[in-house]
Every structure is written in structure tokens, then in C-alpha cells.
């Protein structure tokens, strides 16, 4: 699968570790294999990019299945889980880290503090990205909006901040417009291929590659987004169309309000 996306023109592939924290793996009785599973995922991705200059491996860290703001898990337990997974990913050789599908600002802050502490302890410098998920209601699951997220995350030395999952690109426009004028760093956008539907008992995404690419090009050309990709429902065909759509497009200049 990594190879198919790289062949389509992707410059970065994510490790298959979105749900590879001990918190999630314990639900399947394999939490004791956390380090092993993360290391294997990094090895798979690194094998895929071998011999492909200018291609990188991003270590994916999902939100787990517990939200601290809702009392699902203690801060100490969440911190320990992130530290274990981060250590495995970094020691296995990822080029950057992505905290994605973030739904709880408390969770993000705990993860980031743990991330930068772990990198310091390991003596490593790895770029850190954050991607939040906002529902069609306009907020994260715990009720925070894009403004609250931006203010909360601005003090951290992030490589980028942006959105992924939950919706297609059309439902992200207002949030990205806000970041265009309020977020001082790089912006990323990785939408789903529209909203999922159930067809014959299977989840299906209706947004076709050409339309996906057209909408994503606008984010780069008009909103100054510099990192683009796809989340649920994204196929190599979507990435191929996206690469062609933005190949010669430079991110629009942005003026951030003071």
C-alpha cells in the first residue's frame, strides 16, 4: 500500500500505527507488543521509500480510544502510552511525527508535552505536526472550535497545524480560512473523501479524484496551505490527481492578523 501511494506521487507516507498505542492494543490483548508493532510499521514504511530520494516516513499517533477531558483515562496513563509509542517510533527511524485526528485539547497538550520531553531525552530533533478533527457541528468532539485549538497550540514549536478526517474538503473551508489569517505557521489539510455512506452494508466515500483535487488546489492557491493529503476513503487515484493539481501551484502568501 505504501508503494502504491508513492507511485501515485506521495512525498510522505504514514506508518500504520494510528491505533498502535498500548491503550488500543490492550483492547485486543496485545499491548505487550506495542514497541514491536510500531518498529515493524516503521520498517515497512522505510523499506517502501528506499531508493526514492525526497520521500519521507511520518510516524502516526492517533487519539487512542480515550479522551481525558471526558474522564475516560487519567493524564498519567495517557502520557505513559504516548511516551512508549513515541519512543518506539523515533528509535525506529521516523522522519517526522504526526499527532492526528485530535479531538480533545487536553489530549493534544498532554501528547505534545510528552513528545517534546521524549525527543529531548532521546537527544533527537524530529519535526512534530498536529492535525485536529472538527465535526460538521464546527467543533471537536469535546466542543472546542478552531480558534480555541489555534490559541492553545501556538506556544508549541510545531512544524505544522491543520485538519484531517470527519468531513470532506468542503466542510473544512471556514476553518482553513480562519487559520489562513490567525495561524502563524504552516497549515495542513487532509480531508476524507466526502462524508461516508453505507452502500450494501459497506462504508463508501463518494468524492471522486478529480473533484477532490480541484477543491484541494484551492486550499493551496487561495488559502496558503502548504501540506496536503487525504484521510479516510483516499485512494492512490485521489493522491495522483492531487499531485497533478498542485504540482505547479505555490501556496498563496498569507497575512496573519496580529
Segments and roles (model prediction):
Residues 1-258:
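Domain-level signal for soluble alpha/beta catalytic cores
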Amino acid at each position: 500500500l505504501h508503494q502504491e501511494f508513492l507511485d501515485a506521487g506521495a512525498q510522505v507516507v504514514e506508518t500504520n500505527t494510528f491505533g498502535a498505542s498500548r491503550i488500543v492494543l490492550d483492547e485486543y490483548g496485545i499491548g505487550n507488543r506495542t514497541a514491536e508493532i510500531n518498529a515493524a510499521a516503521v520498517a515497512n514504511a522505510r523499506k517502501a521509500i528506499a531508493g526514492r530520494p525526497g520521500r519521507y516516513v511520518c510516524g502516526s499517533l492517533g487519539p487512542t480510544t480515550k479522551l481525558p477531558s471526558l474522564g475516560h483515562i487519567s493524564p498519567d496513563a495517557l502520557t505513559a502510552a504516548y511516551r512508549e509509542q513515541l519512543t518506539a517510533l523515533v528509535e525506529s527511524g521516523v522522519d517526522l511525527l504526526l499527532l492526528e485526528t485530535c479531538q480533545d485539547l487536553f489530549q493534544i497538550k498532554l501528547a505534545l508535552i510528552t513528545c517534546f520531553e521524549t525527543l529531548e531525552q532521546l537527544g533527537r530533533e524530529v519535526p512534530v505536526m498536529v492535525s485536529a478533527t472538527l465535526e460538521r457541528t464546527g467543533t471537536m468532539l469535546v466542543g472546542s472550535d478552531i480558534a480555541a485549538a489555534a490559541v492553545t497550540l501556538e506556544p508549541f514549536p510545531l512544524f505544522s497545524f491543520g485538519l484531517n478526517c470527519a468531513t470532506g474538503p468542503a466542510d473544512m473551508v471556514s476553518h482553513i480560512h480562519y487559520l489562513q489569517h490567525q495561524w502563524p505557521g504552516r497549515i495542513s489539510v487532509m480531508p476524507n473523501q466526502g462524508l461516508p455512506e453505507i452502500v450494501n452494508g459497506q462504508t463508501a466515500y463518494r468524492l471522486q479524484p478529480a473533484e477532490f483535487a480541484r477543491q484541494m488546489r484551492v486550499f493551496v492557491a487561495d488559502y496558503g496551505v502548504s501540506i496536503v493529503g487525504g484521510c479516510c476513503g483516499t485512494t492512490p487515484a485521489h493522491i495522483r490527481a492531487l499531485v497533478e493539481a498542485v504540482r505547479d501551484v505555490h501556496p498563496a502568501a498569507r497575512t496573519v492578523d496580529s
